[in-house]
């Protein structure tokens, strides 16, 4: 069986050159990117990684990839990350893994952003996947109520144990469901006006290259 995620994830490593500062995304596809980068580092590649989550940080450390915090780098040469959805206008939803705030901060500091996806992540309109909102625990119910007044349905994200999911930053996540984001710019502006929302999962002006792996194993490169 063809592993689309592995194909897309490993393909992105072709953009990595010696001496680069590399943003390391979070998720099941970029997992394979990081595994491949670990092999390349062990074979003599010199890079510095900037992790977008504790999960990625641990994986990179175990593979021997040198790491720095975002505070300790001036800029990032290239960031490789996954996506939950992306449309033909290069607008995406991220944050299914809960790392949206750090992912967006790293993406913003990057000269180039590559997203690695399998073909079902390419959509005509955003919204099949829930849109995550990272909210502070203090008063999160107020955020939920404000959205309800706008007829926006949300679910508080929970772990499989039933406990509330807590991000690496100590925050909660509200997932907007049953919504289509045809005017993503409007949504971005709307959400920015609600106190308590730390960040949202709309990534509108970040990605430069999409590496899409198809079911037959072929790779499609989509560039701006």
Curated annotation (Swiss-Prot):
Catalytic site positions: 103
Presence of the UniProt keyword DNA repair in the record: no
Protein name per the record: Ribose-5-phosphate isomerase A
Enzyme class: isomerase
Pathway assigned to this chain's UniProt record: Carbohydrate degradation; pentose phosphate pathway; D-ribose 5-phosphate from D-ribulose 5-phosphate (non-oxidative stage): step 1/1
Subunit structure: Homodimer.
Pfam family, one: Rib_5-P_isom_A
Natural source organism: Listeria monocytogenes serovar 1/2a (strain ATCC BAA-679 / EGD-e)
Keyword Metal-binding on entry: no
Chain residues that bind substrate: 26-29, 81-84, 94-97, 121
Family: Belongs to the ribose 5-phosphate isomerase family.
């Amino acid at each position: 069986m063809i592993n689309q995620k592995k194909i897309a994830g490993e393909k992105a490593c072709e953009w990595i050159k010696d001496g680069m500062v590399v943003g390391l995304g979070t998720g099941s596809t970029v997992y394979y990117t990081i595994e491949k980068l670990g092999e390349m580092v062990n074979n003599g590649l010199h890079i510095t990684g900037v992790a977008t989550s504790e999960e990625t940080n641990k994986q990179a450390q175990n593979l021997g990839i040198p790491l720095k915090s975002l505070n300790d780098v001036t800029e990032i040469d290239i960031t490789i990350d996954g996506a939950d959805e992306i449309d033909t206008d290069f607008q995406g939803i991220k944050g299914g893994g809960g790392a949206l705030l750090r992912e967006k901060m790293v993406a913003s500091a990057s000269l180039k952003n590559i997203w690695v996806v399998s073909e079902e992540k390419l959509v005509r309109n955003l919204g099949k996947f829930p849109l995550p909102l990272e909210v502070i625990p203090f008063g999160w119910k107020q955020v939920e109520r404000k959205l309800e007044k706008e007829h926006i349905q949300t679910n508080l994200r929970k772990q499989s144990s039933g406990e509330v999911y807590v991000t690496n930053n100590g925050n909660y996540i509200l997932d907007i469901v049953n919504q289509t984001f045809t005017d993503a710019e409007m949504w971005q502006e709307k959400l920015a006006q609600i106190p308590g929302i730390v960040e949202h999962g709309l990534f509108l002006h970040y990605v430069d290259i999409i590496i899409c792996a198809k079911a037959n194993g072929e790779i499609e490169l989509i560039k701006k």
